[in-house]
Amino acid sequence: MKSDIEIAQSIALKPITEIVEKVGIAFDDIELYGKYKAKLSFDKINEVKSNPVGKLILVTAINPTPAGEGKSTMSIGLADALNKIGKKTMIALREPSLGPVMGIKGGAAGGGYAQVLPMEDINLHFTGDMHAITTANNALSALIDNHLQQGNELGIDQRRIIWKRVLDLNDRALRHVIVGLGSPVNGVPREDGFDITVASEIMAILCLATDLKDLKERLANIVVAYDYNRKPVYVRDLKVEGALTLILRDAIKPNLVQTIYGTPALVHGGPFANIAHGCNSVLATSTALRLADYTVTEAGFGADLGAEKFLDIKVPNLPTSPDAVVVVATLRALKMHGGVAKTDLNQENVEAVRAGFANLERHVNNMRQYGVPVVVAINEFVADTEAEIAVLKELCQSIDVPVELASVWANGAEGGVALAETVVKVIEQEKANYQRLYNDQDSVEEKVRKIVKNIYGGDAVQFSAKAKNQLKQFAEFGWDKLPVCMAKTQYSFSDNPNLLGAPSGFDITIREFVPKTGAGFIVALTGDVMTMPGLPKHPAALNMDVSEEGTAIGLF
């Protein structure tokens, strides 16, 4: 079998102008970035707002193994399969961060014969969105430091600046730094740090904004620091929201590319799901819904993280809610949740599949709490055995959830036809009755408790002394009714990455909160979740090169 990049490089791409005609996008509606990439114009985005809204399919997964379970691959393959069976379909995905691409994951544009192309461009610099977000974020940092240097009219307490710089790389050495050293002309010395770009609040804002006006308002509402009276200092106090919006003027426009099978794809925005809300942009998803009859989108990591945030944070900003949720499962992940060591996951173990099924069952039941029909997609791997597949299908039938085997990685659109037909049948026969997990009027504390109890299966929530003090502050500042974005390990329902399966009887500890008032939510930090990852011992970058002709080598 060829590698992902070899498959991608063997495909003869069609001009993006030809691809987008399938969904009624004309040459004048796009801004070209070469022959195979484009951005959608504001004029077209506004024009289609009066169009009927199509069906929305959310793809999520069980708690993953470190290698991931193929959500992006399944999303792409499902969209291709829907087109193959005659359904006018678009896909709306996140764009990858360069940090994980160079670090542990390699490329992140699908895999095998279910990829979005040109994958090298998408994985590297694409249309420059990540750089624009990085620049806007760091421009704000520079403007804060300049404000301190020029007299500090707002009385910002330099010990309580919460805005960090960012970089779209994994670089643990930058987690904690001191800026302003050297002499008085170099600024006011203070502690600072770097997050990865996809953890920036500006990334979350870009992905939730509905237009430039909304983007500017959200940027103005960012809290960057506290003054000497411990009152919040906003971007609007610095009067720089206009400049930040200008930097992001083009980045907010969704990017258009294609799959191997020519399905039009909107790839835009990429917040992580363990430290942010983990969904592609509202603009991309909303626009796809008005251009196609079916839109397939995904939410990062397992359904306890990305899907919960999609349903509780993103959906209120969309013109519709999901008509179906597809939960991706792999036999290797189920065996891991059933107690099998990572080194033995390729060996047949039917009993481990039975034991690990508890993880899948909880995710299915969690999605049903939102009133949305669920379909299970088994992402097929070479090491899967007939006995393991049979027992998984039997277990799914026992909880009355439709299940289909999909081999889109190996067989492309054809490998997803059965799944596509089942998803369409479920959408046509079962009407979704979406409801959020919590109400707007619930306090931050109540929202956290509902997520922990109803989604994670935990017993109780423990709040640190710092978190308790912050809750009092939030009530004072009027932030106590904002949605909650949980920052938690992706490997477990709990805050302990080693507690696999479907654990119960555990508590979740909230060590602190981070207000993201521009994005419109409060981040609750659990465990040791890092906002700036480090590189592994053998980074994926060690396998990468470029030929003398300029061809990418080893990019997954």
Curated annotation (Swiss-Prot):
Molecular-function GO term, any one: formate-tetrahydrofolate ligase activity
UniProt entry keywords in alphabetical sequence: ATP-binding, Ligase, Nucleotide-binding, One-carbon metabolism
Recorded metabolic or biological pathway in which this protein acts: One-carbon metabolism; tetrahydrofolate interconversion
Protein known as: Formate--tetrahydrofolate ligase
Catalytic activity: (6S)-5,6,7,8-tetrahydrofolate + formate + ATP = (6R)-10-formyltetrahydrofolate + ADP + phosphate
GO annotation (BP), single: tetrahydrofolate interconversion
NCBIfam families linked: PRK13505.1 (NF010030)
Residues reported to bind ATP: 65-72
Enzyme class: ligase
Record-listed E.C. numbers: 6.3.4.3
Family recorded in the similarity comment: Belongs to the formate--tetrahydrofolate ligase family.
